[in-house]
Design a protein with these regions (language model features):
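Zinc-dependent deaminase catalytic domain
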Residues: 1-217
Length: 217
């Protein structure tokens, strides 16, 4: 399957998933992709990929500067699948500022993820290990939906992220609007809340609260 070139924004057919993007991050994506993949219906059809919108800020000497931002999707072709979280870690570890590894005690990286799905348990373990090994990195994960929230392994994966210092939360309507503003091509167009966005967000947040607050769940 040919790769979609940067700048081309194919509109997905109704009830069909768009073709995957290359592994390199893009700065923004189309509003059609956003509405298709970031709906917070608990179990939507044909949303098998995961989109990760990220922003990285570096704080040094009391001053903050942006290191980078963009959008990753799960990588499927032509190699073995690589989830969006791992694509981000590979990108982040290659950044010159991070590779220098000469961080002063007060120097921090603030990383924010807006994700269409919460991390799977395998990715959660890898991200948690990365955070434990790099205490200068502070991660906030805001997920539109929870991935297999009733399965113990996935629940434990989310708890491992919290235990490693990550802030894990469900996206609120305000978070969806912020993600639209930062990462959607047509962000100047009005963001329309879809039916059920409020109640779905509250329901998913309650489920996540139960998972994170109950180790025996």
């Amino acid at each position: 399957m040919p790769r979609q070139r940067r700048g081309l924004r194919a509109r997905p057919r109704r009830h069909s998933a768009p073709v995957p993007w290359p592994s390199n991050p893009v700065s923004r994506f189309s509003r059609h992709y956003f509405y298709f993949h970031f709906t917070n219906q608990p179990y939507p059809e044909d949303r098998k990929g995961c989109y990760l919108c990220f922003r990285v800020e570096r704080t040094q000497g009391g001053l903050s500067s942006e290191v980078g931002s963009g959008v990753f999707e799960n990588e499927f072709y032509p190699k073995e699948p690589v989830h969006a979280e791992i694509c981000f870690l590979n990108w982040f570890k290659a950044q010159p500022a991070f590779q220098a590894q000469r961080l002063a005690p007060e120097e921090k990286y603030q990383v924010t993820w807006f994700m269409s799905w919460s991390p799977c348990f395998q990715c959660a373990r890898q991200v948690a290990k990365f955070l434990r090994d790099h205490t200068s990195v502070q991660l906030s994960i805001l997920a539109a939906r929870l991935y297999y929230p009733r399965r113990p392994q996935y629940q434990q994966g989310l708890r491992s992220l919290q235990g490693a210092g990550a802030h894990v939360a469900v996206m609120t309507p305000a978070d969806f609007a912020s993600c639209w503003e930062m990462f959607v091509d047509d962000h100047k167009k009005r963001f329309w809340y879809w039916k059920g966005i409020y109640i779905n967000s509250c329901s998913l947040a309650k489920s996540l609260e139960d998972i994170l607050g109950n180790p025996e769940n």
